[in-house]
């Protein structure tokens, strides 16, 4: 099995005050299938806008929770995200893998923010956590490469009391 999510451009806006917004979400492969490959490459997640007053909506650029043999998330850009979220539920996660990938995880050459727009801008005081690249759940025998990623443009216009973890 090969699942390929390549060369997409995604623009999203959400004006409600709860829930979550995810640009690309891969899920459902369980139990682990060591011969499966998931490829998420060369995508642009652009301008996810969560604008409900006092929103607690989470923003995620790319998310994988499937248990494949190989996971490649390479050369993607997540940029121009904005939020009015003031609570911890309004977290920003650029790229996350929570799938129990068996053999290889490659999360390389991605940009969270670039010269055109930063990764995330909060327009209110917030305690929403910021996670750049978050990877967990793989077995100790899995080879992991998280290299040459660029994280920039994390803006808190009115201040922040949040944790920030970039990789």
Predicted regions and their residues:
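Surface-exposed loop/turn motifs in large extracellular/passenger domains
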Residues: 1-17, 24-52, 58-85, 91-120, ...
């Amino acid at each position: 099995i090969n699942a390929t999510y390549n060369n997409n451009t995604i623009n999203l806006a959400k004006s409600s005050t709860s829930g979550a917004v995810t640009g690309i979400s891969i899920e459902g492969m369980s139990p682990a299938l060591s011969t499966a490959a998931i490829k998420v490459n060369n995508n642009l997640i652009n301008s996810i806008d969560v604008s409900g007053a006092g929103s607690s909506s989470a923003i995620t650029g790319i998310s994988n929770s499937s248990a494949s043999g190989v996971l490649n998330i390479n050369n993607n850009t997540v940029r121009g995200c904005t939020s009015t979220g003031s609570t911890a539920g309004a977290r920003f996660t650029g790229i996350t893998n929570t799938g129990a990938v068996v053999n290889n995880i490659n999360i390389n050459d991605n940009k969270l923010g670039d010269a055109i727009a930063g990764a995330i801008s909060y327009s209110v005081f917030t305690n929403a956590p910021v996670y750049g690249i978050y990877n967990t759940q793989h077995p100790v025998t899995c080879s992991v490469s998280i290299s040459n990623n660029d994280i920039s443009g994390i803006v808190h216009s009115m201040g922040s009391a949040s944790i920030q973890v970039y990789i």
